[in-house]
């Protein structure tokens, strides 16, 4: 641990002057941003010893339980049916281009082999396997990008002090060394960026636990130093932080929890300012919980999930769709069925999602748009006979049904394009019309 801490100190000192004038992303980083933006669909995994309680990832806080009580779960955690290759094959079948998994959640338990704490899946459980290592190898084999979620807040450690607003019932003494905690996190991040190959993104969460302004958060968490350290180890790795604010210097993407960019239906994004330059991502639960909740059967329908994916793409954002695996390491069948159905839809309609940007207009009463090259894809999510596409910036060459290539009647007016839609297929979630222009700018 001392050796790791000393190494981190040297890294931070050596790169301080390099970044003194502000963060400049590397060519690899810019390339990763582009690939990330084109991916449009990823899988989020919340998995840890909390899955044994079947009560979601916040079980320790919500029940509540002391850390001493909760930590005994590790001794019984044995996900005998976990198969990294099976997971990755399923995610590929779903049409996902990357996955993001909890390396450590708020309960403080690490799902990887770490020398920074014995409270981890290899040293504290009878399973004694590094699931992140197995997933990194499976992802590399299948060409799926791997990202790591990492919690800034911690309900288990004494050095997470002063305490935040959550985890107050953990039974910790009212004392601790905050700098020790920061060093612990940086030691773990160094391991994650050193032992698991190229990582797409470090996905942070939890700085909101202590509250504060943009400046106060930076001062408390020393984010700029942490970000510089991360980029010094893997210059290409992206950094995102679920702080629900505008982006901080050193961040490479922006995420929105349970909402599309610019919306605040979930109540997390009131103070969020949408970046106009960075890749965007919407993370959404498939049911009502992030971690495994045995009673939660309120899964979104396949149609609703497809609408979410389409609307995210129309907002220049990826959809990061969450699943909470069971304690035995399997993906709930309800989730697997929906993933496979989304994969079949993307096999046919992926051209209108992957590698697209949002169209030139906000959501309309009939639906949304995506764009690629000189084509504008009209996603008619709400059944209509005639629609107005409020865009008149270029000459329209053709309008055809994406399903069969048949021509669609159109009239180009000063206020936009009027489309007379063909008969909608029974049960069709998204009727797509391809508009091809002479050029689009």
Residue ranges and their predicted role:
Residues 1-22:
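Bacterial Sec-dependent N-terminal signal peptides
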Residues 21-441:
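Mature catalytic domains of secreted/periplasmic carbohydrate-active enzymes
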